[in-house]
């Protein structure tokens, strides 16, 4: 049976778009409306991600996909969402290769990314897995966050209670983009999405991330354990990042951005307006 003969609910599978550790994403087509969708198929239950995305949709949060369907497919669970053709990384690379003033375009993308975080955090959700793979771009050039499997509520509105900052021994999300605060044992909060976003922005501006080419050190500890030798080294480099940027790049945008987000307390609301202004100022 070819891929195009497979149906998941009302969606015909067109082609495989990508595969992760726990799921595979396909491009699909609704059998009646012919609307193109993204189909995420996983052997793991996706109820948590589905609930997060449904909640964000109910809260009318801009910058996230629309959840179109959720259900079973054989032994797998599946969700159908809005389809986006371009990954953020590919979109940015095309900007650098084809635009007369690519930096100006990338600055605009940074403003969009900050606004998406503002929108999500205003709904009391932390994304928790900020990295280039988890952002797409629609046909109009609008950036969208995806993959909410690690996302969580950081504030209980009904009880008016902020999540406790408990000592944690494991990183959440990619070690490469995990916030420095997580490396030193803090729980995740909005400040950490903003810190991880800054690390990601380095790559968007083609700035070398100091820890990106690190060789993983062999250890009996899990890779996500903050005591893993590789994570201890990453923590040191992330701690010294601002000085690295000052000396190496004399960066006008990311140095002041990191200065602001690095000073945030666990429960402190990030100053999204101020961050947007940093990247809205022309060089």
Tell me what each language-model feature is.
Residues 159, 170-186:
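Protein kinase subdomain VIII
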Residues 84-95:
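Structural motif in protein kinase domains
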Residues 138-172:
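Activation segment/activation loop of eukaryotic-type protein kinase catalytic domains
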Residues 109-110:
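Activation segment signature within eukaryotic-like protein kinase domains
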Residues 22-48:
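ATP-binding glycine-rich loop module of kinase domains
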Residues 66-77, 85:
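Short beta-strand micro-motifs within the conserved protein kinase catalytic domain, predominantly
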Residues 182-247:
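Conserved C-lobe activation region of Hanks-type protein kinase-like domains
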Residues 121-138:
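Catalytic-loop of the protein kinase fold
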């Amino acid at each position: 049976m070819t891929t195009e003969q497979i149906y998941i609910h009302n969606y015909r599978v067109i082609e495989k778009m990508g595969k992760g550790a726990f799921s595979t994403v396909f491009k699909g087509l609704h059998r009646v409306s012919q609307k193109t969708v993204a189909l995420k198929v996983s052997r793991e239950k996706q109820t948590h991600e589905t609930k997060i995305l449904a909640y964000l949709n109910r809260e009318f949060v801009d910058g996230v996909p629309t959840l179109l369907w959720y259900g079973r497919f054989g032994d797998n669970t599946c969700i159908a969402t809005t389809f986006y053709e371009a990954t953020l990384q590919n979109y940015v690379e095309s900007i650098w290769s084809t635009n007369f003033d690519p930096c100006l375009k990338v600055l605009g993308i940074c403003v969009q990314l900050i606004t998406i975080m503002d929108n999500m955090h205003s709904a009391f959700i932390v994304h928790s897995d900020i990295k280039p793979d988890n952002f797409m771009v629609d046909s109009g050039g609008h950036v969208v966050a995806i993959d909410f499997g690690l996302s969580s509520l950081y504030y209980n509105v009904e009880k008016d209670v902020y999540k406790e900052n408990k000592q944690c021994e494991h990183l959440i999300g990619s070690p490469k983009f995990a916030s420095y605060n997580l490396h030193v044992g803090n729980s995740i909060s909005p400040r950490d999405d903003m810190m991880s976003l800054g690390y990601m922005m380095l790559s968007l501006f083609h700035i070398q991330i100091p820890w990106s080419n690190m060789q993983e050190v062999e250890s009996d500890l899990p890779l996500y354990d903050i005591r893993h030798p590789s994570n201890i080294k990453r923590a040191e480099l992330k701690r010294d990042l601002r000085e690295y940027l000052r000396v190496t790049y004399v960066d006008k945008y990311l140095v002041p951005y990191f200065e602001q987000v690095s000073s945030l307390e666990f429960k402190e609301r990030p100053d999204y307006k101020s961050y947007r202004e940093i990247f809205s100022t022309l060089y």
